[in-house]
């Protein structure tokens, strides 16, 4: 897991 991956997940969950 990398910072970019976590950021992507957070954005996806935020926009969900």
UniProtKB/Swiss-Prot annotation:
The question of whether DNA repair is a record keyword is answered with yes
Q: Which domain of life is it from?
A: Viruses
Q: Name one GO biological process term.
A: DNA recombination
Give GO MF terms, alphabetically: ATP binding
**What function does this protein fulfil?**
Important in genetic recombination, DNA repair, and replication. Possesses pairing and strand-transfer activity. Interacts with dda and gene 32 proteins.
User: Which family is this sequence assigned to?
Assistant: Belongs to the RecA family.
Which protein are we looking at?
Answer: Recombination and repair protein
